[in-house]
Amino acid sequence: MVKNYSFYQFIMTVRGRKDDKGVFAEQIFEDLAFPKHEDDFNTLSEYIETHSEFTLPMSVFDDLYDDYTEWLKF
């Protein structure tokens, strides 16, 4: 059975980590305009690329999205 959660809901499980993924999760949490109900990679990627408040490399988002797709399976 696959979970039906948005990327934002997954990101909230990453907040508080002391690594780049945790920092990125905190930046997403602080962005009030972040698309909280979205799960599409391209939509999320475009949003992150066009908003300058995200200071970490896109590779961190890519890794988090991979983690998200794995998390949905369990």
From Swiss-Prot:
<dbReference type="Pfam" id="PF06855">
    <property type="entry name" value="YozE_SAM_like"/>
</dbReference>
<dbReference type="InterPro" id="IPR036806">
    <property type="entry name" value="YozE_SAM-like_sf"/>
</dbReference>
<comment type="similarity">
    <text>Belongs to the UPF0346 family.</text>
</comment>
<dbReference type="InterPro" id="IPR010673">
    <property type="entry name" value="UPF0346"/>
</dbReference>
<dbReference type="InterPro" id="IPR023089">
    <property type="entry name" value="YozE_SAM-like"/>
</dbReference>
<protein>
    <recommendedName>
        <fullName>UPF0346 protein SERP0997</fullName>
    </recommendedName>
</protein>
